[in-house]
Curated annotation (Swiss-Prot):
Native species: Bradyrhizobium sp. (strain BTAi1 / ATCC BAA-1182)
Parts forming coiled coils: none
Domain of life: Bacteria
Pfam hit, one: UPF0262
InterPro entries linked: UCP032146 (IPR008321)
Similarity comment text for this entry: Belongs to the UPF0262 family.
Name of the protein in its database record: UPF0262 protein BBta_0898
């Protein structure tokens, strides 16, 4: 078997993601579809290296909301606990609220608006998504190293958790 050095992308990655069912509750087909795509994309391609565990993966990730905090329960592939991080949801509340509002506008526009209007709304949606992704990267700094694309996919999952958490 070939040994890979610490920090190699084969070890610093997520191989499975679960969402806390109590955090997400029931949602419509659009949200379920977004969740499935985000999990698939995240597992297919990511960079995820918990501080102090660089090169010890691959890892599994369980996301949830507990005590009004975002929970990252990180384990090795065999289930051995690595670390659990609890992040305040406060920095994400406005971004997620704005994201939901623009997503509603986007889904409504798809039915009736011109292609130019739909494209403009989608650009705004992507901009807010990027802002949430950067905020997540900042909040994880010193805890878990992630690249921007991994942060984007994780932010999508955070919005799914907020869907129930915000009473949507």
């Amino acid at each position: 078997m070939t040994q890979h050095p610490p920090g190699d992308d084969r070890t610093n990655r997520i191989v499975a993601v679960t969402l806390d069912e109590e955090s997400i509750g029931r949602s419509g087909p659009d949200i379920e579809h977004e969740r499935a795509i985000a999990i698939y994309d995240l597992v297919e391609e990511n960079l995820f290296a918990p501080e102090g565990a660089d090169g010890q993966g691959p890892f599994t990730l369980h996301l949830g909301i507990t005590a009004n905090r975002l929970m990252f329960d990180i384990r090795k592939e065999d289930g051995t606990p690595v670390v659990t991080h609890l992040l305040s949801l406060s920095p994400f509340r406005r971004i997620v609220k704005d994201y939901f509002m623009i997503c509603d506008s986007y889904y409504n526009a798809i039915r009736t608006a011109t292609p130019d209007k739909i494209e403009a709304i989608d650009m705004g949606r992507r901009g807010i998504h990027d802002e949430g992704s950067r905020t997540l990267q900042e909040r994880l700094k010193g805890k878990v190293r992630v690249d921007f694309e991994t942060s984007r996919r994780l932010f999508t999952l955070i919005t799914v958790l907020h869907w129930k958490g915000e009473g949507q």
